[in-house]
Amino acid sequence: MQTGSTPHDDRAGVSANGILGAQARGASGRLLPEIWMQDGAKRVEEALARLLCAEDDGETELMAAMRYATLHGGKRTRALLCLAAGALADTPAHMLDDVGAAIEMMHACTLVHDDLPAMDDDVLRRGLPTVHVKFGEATAILVGDALQAHAFLTLASLNAPGDSPIALVRELAQAVSAEGAAGGQAIDLSLVGKHVELDRIVAMHRMKSGALVRASVRMGALCAVGVNAAHAALYCALDHYSACFGLALQVIDDILDVTADTAALGKTPGKDAAAQKPTCASIMGLQEARQFALDLLRDAGEAIAPLGPRAERLAQLIQRANAYLFKHAPRA
């Protein structure tokens, strides 16, 4: 595994805001979301390919499966959230790319484990056979374990000032702990076949998927402004944004499990209902859930409005989620 920027890395010393230059803005000076999102996703994928490579003896089946889990599709939303928060200041692009890659490794870890027969038992992910289907269940378990380790190793190896690597590791660890994704998944499994209140589902979603969204934003901000009491108001705004945006993404996912097809989802539709899993969509109904998602996205935008143009990229990710919802779950 190669870590950090190399002497030949042409990103070194270039900020996330400066790496695209004028091409990222239209004639009006407005930042073009399709340009920076495509470029950001490409840079993170290049970092993943660099970080997840065999060093000496060729590619093992485990490494091949790890690359399969991380390099074949995905919207890269969490990495883009990190990059967008990193754009709050002139953060070195190479640092954000590697942090974004670490986040995507951890996200892939959670997906690989969630898809296992003992968990959600899914056979499709991102339009391809899930890791346990293609490589076997034992390898899939090891893939998740190894991706988690590589994510932390990537952060610990960053060429970053002060205690930044420690703070980043702490944020990511907290996101997947018993108070985060792992705890949320445990609750999700425990609710199968039960009638529960909406508040219980919302709390579960905030842990299972929302915690990693929050960490993605906070990790980008840590790269931009560090750990400083002077930025308490900034982190408060970002946490509110993350809470609303992360929950909105999961509500949209609940809706699309009902309304979208395999091509749009990249996974098997109707799985939640078939497994008797309570969701926001099943409890609220599709139209109420849709409005709930729209309200959450609006609240996310209001949370970062005081940050002004610095938060332009975070706002554009809200717009992308809105467009995705309108495309795949139009109003009845």
From Swiss-Prot:
It is found in: Cytoplasm. Its cofactor is Mg(2+). Its EC number is 2.5.1.10. Coiled coil: none annotated. (2E)-geranyl diphosphate binds at residues 125, 208-209, 250, 267. InterPro entries: Isoprenoid_synthase_dom_sf, Polyprenyl_synt, Polyprenyl_synt_CS. PANTHER family: FARNESYL DIPHOSPHATE SYNTHASE. Belongs to the FPP/GGPP synthase family. This is Probable farnesyl diphosphate synthase. The gene is fppS.
